[in-house]
Amino acid sequence: MNAQEANFDGLVGPTHNYAGLSFGNVASLNNEKSAANPKAAAKQGLRKMKQLADLGFAQGVLPPQERPSLRLLRELGFSGKDADVIAKAAKQAPELLAAASSASAMWTANAATVSPSADTSDGRVHFTPANLCSKLHRAIEHEATRRTLSTLFADPAHFAVHEALTGTPALGDEGAANHTRFCAEYGKPGIEFFVYGRAEYRRGPEPKRFPARQTFEASRAVAHRHGLAEEATVYAQQDPDVIDAGVFHNDVISVGNRDTLFTHERAFVNKQAIYDTLTAALDARGARLNVIEVPDAAVSVNDAVTSYLFNSQLLSRADGSQVLVVPQECRENANVAAYLDQLAAGNGPIHDVLVFDLRESMKNGGGPACLRLRVVLNEAERAAVTSNVWINDTLFASLDAWIDKHYRDRLAPEDLADPALLDESRTALDELTQILRVGSLYDFQR
């Protein structure tokens, strides 16, 4: 059956702010406590979705999570009415209020790991929400993520939505940001590629400055629960030196699609062995791996981190050609811009480069790839997604007007203490569930 890769982007939430919560994420730390523009952030992401949908790519949207999370704040000991909880947290522990208010669920590459039905033992699409246990503000996401995915992908004949792995350092799981898939065609069996930063029970190199968030054990557990064939599953370790340089997920240093791996020469430990293993595995699936390795002499790791060259989307057109979707920061870095010009002019599979303004997300360390969750669906599976989440002219207009109606154009750290922000967010999300036809998705609606 024909299949297509759909990208489900996270809609930026009304509490988008710069709290500097993500140690190891250079952009997040550099922009700590600056004022954010939630309205601009949401519109920038929505415009990317619309342009890609207009180009013929399957484009869906995932709703924001409810923030601030009163559930977290109450769990942490703040009591009283909702406004009292926020006021107490703001006075006694503003860092916890910031964690409870983060809009980080917008980066849906961390929402889950997804295996298409062509790869799984039971012929269903499998989702495992990421536990994101390395960061408090993200560790609170997985239950709502599971609820959202279970709502959109509800038919058990086609979909299996698992619980997140147990939230312990040994099973630290950051989702699809450390996972990609190679195949001859989307609907045919492929190779699933899991990248980890460290192993809990194996000796090996580890970063010294910043934490490795993904473990080998978590990647292997996801592969096992999805029923992936052992010979079609490849594991690789990310080079700890690039983690220490700010590459906190593999999608900051590599991106793959179909038969192509676009990567930096310093991305992996024992890279040639990894290339050889991927090549042999993909050859058995009827395709030849094409590695586009960017040399450090052309684009340094620092260039990659500041421009987010590899935090790009690599998309296949109907004619088989590929397009690279990059943030505008790539055009503002001379080395990266020169490399992209050379890449597009060459004879390789990447023929076009699309540039987007995602400045608000980028200042928190999230580029095009962070904002999307890839889900390969065949025709029957796509038909089973009955919510109004596919971007078209009508939905775009509704969401654009919804953002104009409900979002602030400035949100500074001190604004998180405003109890009106909670009311504004809940009003907005209540209306959004009607637009997307997802029912009573949020705790406050139940």
UniProtKB/Swiss-Prot annotation:
Pfam families associated with the record: AstB (PF04996)
Keyword set includes Acyltransferase: no
GO MF: N-succinylarginine dihydrolase activity
EC number: 3.5.3.23
Annotated residues for binding of substrate: 19-28, 110, 137-138, 213, 251, 364
Active site residues per record: 174, 249, 370
Main EC class the enzyme belongs to: hydrolase
Keywords: Arginine metabolism, Hydrolase
Catalytic reactions of this protein: N(2)-succinyl-L-arginine + 2 H2O + 2 H(+) = N(2)-succinyl-L-ornithine + 2 NH4(+) + CO2
Pathway the protein takes part in: Amino-acid degradation; L-arginine degradation via AST pathway; L-glutamate and succinate from L-arginine: step 2/5
InterPro entries: AstB_sf, SuccinylArg_d-Hdrlase_AstB
GO biological process: arginine catabolic process to glutamate; arginine catabolic process to succinate
Domain of life: Bacteria
Subunit structure: Homodimer.
Free-text function comment from the UniProt entry: Catalyzes the hydrolysis of N(2)-succinylarginine into N(2)-succinylornithine, ammonia and CO(2).
Similarity-based family: Belongs to the succinylarginine dihydrolase family.
HAMAP family hit by this protein: AstB (MF_01172)
NCBIfam families xrefs: arg_catab_astB, PRK13281.1
Protein name, as recorded: N-succinylarginine dihydrolase
